[in-house]
Curated annotation (Swiss-Prot):
The lineage of its organism: Eukaryota, Metazoa, Chordata, Craniata, Vertebrata. May be involved in transcriptional regulation. It comes from Mus musculus (Mouse). It is found in: Nucleus. Residues 1-45, 120-154, 166-199, 321-377, 505-530 are annotated as: Disordered. This is Zinc finger protein 579. It comes from the Eukaryota. Pfam families: zf-C2H2 (PF00096). GO terms for cellular component: nucleus. The gene is Znf579. SUPFAM superfamilies: beta-beta-alpha zinc fingers. GO terms for molecular function: DNA-binding transcription factor activity, RNA polymerase II-specific; transcription cis-regulatory region binding; zinc ion binding.
């Protein structure tokens, strides 16, 4: 017989209950020890003064404060992207072509990412007893302490352990002992102070680096309206060619080094000869040369080329104007744009109602799976951190951000005046342009170089226009009163004045003289049929009147009627 286990002692719970009770007791005791302020007591959270987010360590708080500064001092040398932290930049650089791979110690396979290597070790070599350390195939530069007197001595190799992605251990040659480890302090207060000091130093360094980066003048608008690159002294006719110029790209992003090559521009406009890489871009560009603006705002009367422009404009009038449907909402607008904006958010698409109204007319308040409500239209959603000015679109905020930077890279070649935007420089160049101004006033001989200057000038003629309108209304009223007071003399019929035969309806019957036999009624004209009299249809007489009037008119023009 199998030996049975001894019964539990009297008064003691079974094994399972005893284990559970022990676990619960340990957990409660450990928690009580922490709460009493022992060595493992929780630290007070550190709030961010800008957004109120809580952090456990000062270093994390100092690193988080970089996100509110908007600075990205670590720029990628291969593309225009920039990052706030060096770790993010190093992780981004792995996607730019071949990087030194990680070799597996158990097989000849290599992996570009440490996470992929760890996954490979867990799946392929989980049950085998192999050295799970892997070595990265990187040619490390010798340190400063490794001088020429140490030639022929084996140098240490940097080995990446599979269990940690960022940590590295140093293997020293056999027979040599590793340098003695520096004793580290175990006081948590000293470690917190060091972390806070390191975070503050990193923050100051990044702020100083970002403040020292100043943009220098790169582009000059010449007298012949060409854009001159000040680095290589090459001129360009359009802004697009200037942007594609290698000198204005970030360092390292030259042809064949970083990023895909630019797409060739095969679609050219036949009017202005501007080229585009995609056909829908050319179709959308052709609307610039068209004067047709079929989409009219029902609130202010402004007209637009595309329905998406009208929807964007109607946000200015507030949320009530967005409830009314657009004119021609059932049509699929922006056909020229190739449907790029169709059905993708409030900037484009077929629907015209606010809030994603359905075709059934239920509107955007049908509940259920409705999208979350957007902020009220007409109110700013993006605020400038420098001056507090609000904008409705993020693009407007980016354009406004140029005003707070001291860089003025665009300079006028005639008066040496500097500007922050290329559009401001082009508008200023109209001052030096020869010939008359392109915007004349229809009321006076003055001309203006800018359209908004003409609109501002036309306010001077507002009183003159109102006076002319009052005079015109008074003259019209006087003519109406004169016409009502003086009776008009009876005018002879047009047929009598021109000597044409009168129609039958206008012939007056003379009474017969006494003694004359009664005459039979005259025969009907040839063009009439018996059916006209039977059905009492008098349209034939009206047709005859119209024919006679047209013949008389042709006779008056020179006898063209045959």
């Amino acid at each position: 017989m199998d030996p049975q286990p001894p019964p539990p002692a009297q008064g003691s719970p079974p094994h399972r209950d005893r284990g559970r009770g022990r676990g619960r007791g340990r957990g409660r005791g450990r928690g009580r020890g922490r709460g009493r302020g022992g060595a493992g007591a929780p630290r007070a959270p550190l709030p961010c003064p800008t957004c109120g987010r809580l952090f456990r360590f000062p270093y994390y708080l100092s690193r988080h404060r970089l996100s509110h500064s908007g600075l990205r001092p670590h720029a990628c040398p291969l593309c225009p992207k920039a990052f706030r932290r060096p770790a993010h930049l190093s992780r981004h650089l792995r996607g730019h072509g071949p990087q030194p791979p990680l070799r597996c110690a158990a097989c000849p396979r290599t992996f570009p990412e440490p996470a992929q290597l760890r996954r490979h070790l867990a799946q392929e070599h989980a049950g085998s007893e192999v050295d799970l350390s892997t070595q990265r195939a990187v040619k490390e530069e010798p340190e400063a302490s490794w001088g020429p007197q140490d030639e022929g001595v084996e140098q240490p190799a940097t080995v990446v352990v599979a269990g940690a992605e960022e940590e590295a251990t140093t293997q020293w040659p056999a027979g040599d002992s590793a340098p003695a480890a520096v004793p580290t302090s175990t006081d948590p207060r000293e470690s917190e102070a060091k972390e806070a000091e390191a975070g503050a130093a990193e923050l100051r360094a990044e702020l100083a680096l970002a403040a020292g980066r100043q943009e220098e003048k790169q582009v000059l608008l010449q007298a012949d309206w060409t854009l001159l690159c000040l680095r290589c002294r090459e001129a360009f006719a359009t802004k697009g060619e200037l942007k594609a110029h290698p000198c204005l790209r970030p360092e390292g992003e030259q042809e064949g080094e970083g990023g895909p090559p630019p797409r060739p521009k095969r679609h050219q406009c036949s009017i202005c000869l501007k080229a585009f890489a995609r056909p829908w871009s050319l179709s959308r560009h052709r609307l610039v040369h068209s004067t047709d603006r079929p989409f009219v705002c029902p609130d202010c009367g402004l007209a637009f080329r595309l329905a998406s422009y009208l929807r964007q404009h109607r946000r200015v009038h507030g949320p009530l104007s967005l409830l009314a449907p657009l004119p021609g909402a059932g049509k699929k607008d922006d056909k020229a744009s190739g449907g790029r904006n169709s059905g993708k958010g409030p900037e484009g698409g077929e629907g015209a109602e606010c809030g994603g109204a359905s075709e059934g007319g239920e509107g955007g308040h049908n509940g259920g799976d409705a999208t979350p409500a957007r902020p009220p239209a007409g109110e700013p959603r993006f605020w400038c951190p420098e001056c507090g000015k609000g904008f409705r679109r993020r693009a407007h905020l980016r354009q406004h951000g140029v005003t707070h930077s001291g860089a003025r890279p665009f300079q006028c070649v005639r008066c040496q005046r500097e500007f922050k935007r290329l559009a401001d420089l082009a508008r200023h160049a109209q001052v030096h342009a020869g010939g008359p101004a392109p915007h004349p006033c229809p009321r006076c001989p003055r001309r203006f170089s800018r359209a908004y200057s003409l609109l501002r000038h036309q306010r001077c003629h507002r009183a003159e226009l109102e006076r002319a309108e009052l005079e015109r209304a008074a003259a019209l009223q006087e003519l109406q009163t004169q016409a009502s007071q003086s009776p008009q003399p009876p005018q002879p019929l047009k047929q009598e004045a021109e000597g044409l035969p009168l129609p039958i309806a206008h012939i007056k019957e003379e009474p017969p003289s006494p003694g004359t036999p009664p005459q039979s009624p005259p025969a009907p004209p040839v063009f009439l049929s018996a059916s006209c009299f039977d059905s009492q249809d008098h349209s034939a007489f009206e047709m005859e009147d119209e024919e006679m009037d047209s013949k008389a008119h042709l006779c008056g023009l020179g006898g063209l009627a045959s």
